[in-house]
Amino acid sequence: MMITLRKLPLAVAVAAGVMSAQAMAVDFHGYARSGIGWTGSGGEQQCFQATGAQSKYRLGNECETYAELKLGQEVWKEGDKSFYFDTNVAYSVNQQNDWESTDPAFREANVQGKNLIEWLPGSTIWAGKRFYQRHDVHMIDFYYWDISGPGAGIENIDLGFGKLSLAATRSTEAGGSYTFSSQNIYDEVKDTANDVFDVRLAGLQTNPDGVLELGVDYGRANTTDGYKLADGASKDGWMFTAEHTQSMLKGYNKFVVQYATDAMTTQGKGQARGSDGSSSFTEELPDGTKINYANKVINNNGNMWRILDHGAISLGDKWDLMYVGMYQNIDWDNNLGTEWWTVGVRPMYKWTPIMSTLLEVGYDNVKSQQTGDRNNQYKITLAQQWQAGDSIWSRPAIRIFATYAKWDEKWGYIKDGDNISRYAAATNSGISTNSRGDSDEWTFGAQMEIWW
């Protein structure tokens, strides 16, 4: 009995140590950027984006503090079978003060189960909110294939010649459907859920060090019983993607071709906007009565083409390079589409394994389908950087920068709009007659960026 009692504290200590080790085995990942900047003509840092373009060249051209904090853990494992719980909370503020309150965005909360289906070894089933197999161009922060959101699916089914993934996700648009009360008045407007069904076949060997990925996305508006879409709403649409990835020069090149129809053209990345894509508006009658109407302007019947080439390569011991070239044409029946092309490079010269100089040059040109006018802008940034490693991808990084931008614009700028409406390619009320005009500006500052 004495021996047992003497062994008990040791057993408790060992058990506590094991449980403590398990409790600490939490994966912590994330992304963050923050800094301070000034504008040459005065005031805080100004950021530059061509009106109608869906992105901007980001080096020395980001005016917010943004962070994504991810916590995850493998909560169960038996042999090659496992369950993993993943979360992600994101924050964004204007970096104007010490105390800047904000509501966090709960972007991910999902469980992934690996090798749970005996006859599909290597596959993963999942459910919840998730960043799902996103494809982007880092230097312009542009996501061209991204169906992230609440959903479920199965991925990486090994077919021998490639891997198949199936998923369904959802995105909701405000004010998308309505119901009648009397006299055909749109009395109540309700958010509309849009469902996307995604099929991908990846890992198709095409040539030495080259692989092909093919994808089909179908999205449709899913209205609540008793509600309907505005007359003529696109309701649904398709997006087709082919992406070839070539490993080269210690990096990669990606060549992408995409085609989308109707509801899949607005965001152009695989998420649908199948209702009218707008909020309601209110009319006040002479007697003071207010009536809510659904906005009947339909903004996305048509098609979109996109051809994109981007990559990151090493040009020797001292030089790395990022680059992008893209052409996109949105042709809408309401004549509010755009033709956008962009080209840019970001070379990096490495003075030491942890210190470098970067130069980013980017040009955007956007033509209005309605007016035929073009907006164009080029932006040049020179940055001195200290980073954790000798790659153009090495982070964390601290950089000081100077940016110069020049633009000549003739359509679509809403001077006092927010970051969305100010750069909207087309709004539900038509294209604004305001313009940024022909001008230029320069900024300077410092920024940190990290991912882990």
UniProtKB/Swiss-Prot annotation:
Segment forming the signal sequence: 1-25
Induction or repression: By maltose.
Cross-referenced PANTHER family: CRYPTIC OUTER MEMBRANE PORIN BGLH-RELATED
Its biological purpose: Involved in the transport of maltose and maltodextrins.
Alphabetic keyword roster: Cell outer membrane, Ion transport, Membrane, Porin, Signal, Sugar transport, Transmembrane, Transmembrane beta strand, Transport
Superkingdom of source: Bacteria
UniProt organism field: Salmonella agona (strain SL483)
UniProt subunit comment: Homotrimer formed of three 18-stranded antiparallel beta-barrels, containing three independent channels.
Protein name: Maltoporin
Subcellular location: Cell outer membrane
Listed GO biological process terms: monoatomic ion transport
Pfam families with a match to the protein in the record: LamB
Greasy slide, important in sugar transport (site feature) positions: 31, 66, 99, 252, 393, 451
A cellular-component GO term for this protein: cell outer membrane
Positions marked as site (Important in sugar transport): 143
Catalytic activity: beta-maltose(in) = beta-maltose(out)
Recorded topology in the membrane: Multi-pass membrane protein
GO MF term list: maltodextrin transmembrane transporter activity; maltose transporting porin activity
CDD domains to which the protein is assigned, alphabetical: Maltoporin-like
Similarity annotation: Belongs to the porin LamB (TC 1.B.3) family.
HAMAP family linked to this entry: LamB (MF_01301)
